[in-house]
């Protein structure tokens, strides 16, 4: 009685419940894809997964079961009464009737497992079906690169699938034969019946063909090898190993047939000899002889013999990371830079980023978080036209942090607190007298101090929006707090899925594991449920075959709406001769810009690199998913920028693969590296500047290089971001016969400056935390300017204030309260007052003597007051300013 009840319970527990959960997840995913307008993407993937899964599982089942049933029909009159296996002893007559049902059940289980594996290969199958020709062939075997990107992965999967199918069939049939008595271990040895031998012979002959196919495919794998000095197939691979594998691909089926013939006839010598020959040939041709050839011929003449293969590695790595488009131009540094030239590059100076991301995030959090349940997760860098000026800005969205809600309950977390509110935006270089950032946009509701307006400040979809919410309910949503009380709002967007039936309520309740969705009286037929709100997970759900940047950035479009832009990358592990990254990727393109509306969650994927061969195939598979870049609204195009992450990858490769001469490459004569400050590599940084030979400033991404194991500069790499110039990259190389200071050398000079080191020591002794910001190398005309901000905080949790700016040029290193004053000390002259700060500036070089005398007296009096107060750092500062004024008077 108990067993009869237990069976349906176990069936429900292990079969029905998981199946329903699986179907429920598919249903909610389907509604999500319909909501975002990409239902065809969902169905394409679903049909592919289903079809491939059924095909893989069905073929295995159709092959395994007939073999099993054939083996089960065999009769062996001399079989013993018992089946013995170690301590197990079963009566044969009672066991034989169970073979068929249990065997079929086992076959079904294996087929189900293989079907699930097959369903996971949907992407490789669709890439193969929609493959395109790249137009470039590999230099060794002569296959089009498209074969490696789109065909080879599937062929290797099929090889593994056939191997598994034949081995599983062989093991299952041998087990059946053993149970039926066709295989027996006796005192005379192992006895195998004739039918068993012949059946096994056929399976092994088929298996040898699959092994031969494996040898054939292994030949293509040689093109991914690591030779130490370079990547790809080398001299020994091409002249020995490739020939060996080709030979093995032909002789293995012959060996398999001989083995099968020997097994069929019961000639054991013929059974053992063929596999021994194949293994011996493999060991000699793939291990022994290549090692000897490498040691005695190649190693002594490596450069001469490996030069063509090194050249292949250079060419294909440059293709794999799109390095071929990088234009290398000489940059002849001039250490003479006048005040007039500084003035001519006023826009560059105004846009030097003084505010570092980490201190600014901390400052924004303390000044603009407004309430504890709001959070600034990240600070983004972008450019806008601000009051008619092309300006670089720092921007951070004010998101809702559910972890910091004062009262955590389902109504608060799901119905009332549904979204973040607005952004904080400010210039990259301007500071108040207190050392704090200035703002273009601040507060809740948003107060705009520039001509940038935010008309839709609500953030329902963001980096911190990890859970579902339900909007348009009877409960008003919290919008923002005021001095007189909270302001409420009601969602008015098209995002989310309508919860307009009891069935949908029940399904969502089951999916999110809460009965409150069904029981809540606040949810109406007009209510909508917003889920998959985390923007990174949202786009990954829609396009799982793309890799997405870990740092989405928010923009304000020309209509005042908040949009997220996320860089997306196509990638492959299969480009021959290309050096791989740590994770194995050896082909990468930033081909897609994903845009997510922060209010309604609408997603668009724009093609930023139409020449990417991988994206061409994905666009064939999912034609409704991608839009051309021309379709992007102009209000968003002006905020598209070259990917920070992709330039990092390109720079890491270009540091070696800018050397296109195989001899120079082999000897590493001109190897570069990304400069290291402290224990951290410098990262690319955005800035606005006028590139050499250009007439106006533009938004660029910049990164310097140093020669390997040296601290001076070798080059600087820049990627352009604006308009038609988007994606153009240049490497400006410095003369190799001259010393150009690198960031680490400038850092050492800063530390050796007695005045600066004294000031830093004084601040640290007073308990303040000194935070040294990022050092920026800013090219101006034909010169280089080095800028590093200094932040002071009362303690580790204190408010960081930008208190000093260090500027280095040539042999001079100065530290002043503002960038303006530092530049005046080095170059003299008077720059526009609004350049970097709202603080007082140094006297004009052309001021009247009477004005300078009054300024000198004022500085002297302030210095005396500082001395009386014991403020020695302030005293030193005033004396330095007095010295500056006296020098002006002397002129």
Curated annotation (Swiss-Prot):
Calcium keyword on record: no
InterPro entries given in the database record: UPF0182 (IPR005372)
Keyword Transmembrane: yes
Lineage of the species this protein comes from: Bacteria, Pseudomonadati, Thermodesulfobacteriota, Desulfuromonadia, Geobacterales
Protein name: UPF0182 protein Glov_0814
Regions that span the bilayer: 6-26, 51-71, 102-122, 164-184, 202-222, 244-264, 266-286
Subcellular location: Cell membrane
GO CC terms: extracellular region; plasma membrane
Major localization listed first in the record, in broad terms: membrane
Domain of life of the native organism: Bacteria
Bridged cysteine pairs (disulfide): none
Family: Belongs to the UPF0182 family.
Membrane topology: Multi-pass membrane protein
Keywords for the protein's UniProt record, in alphabetical order: Cell membrane, Membrane, Transmembrane, Transmembrane helix
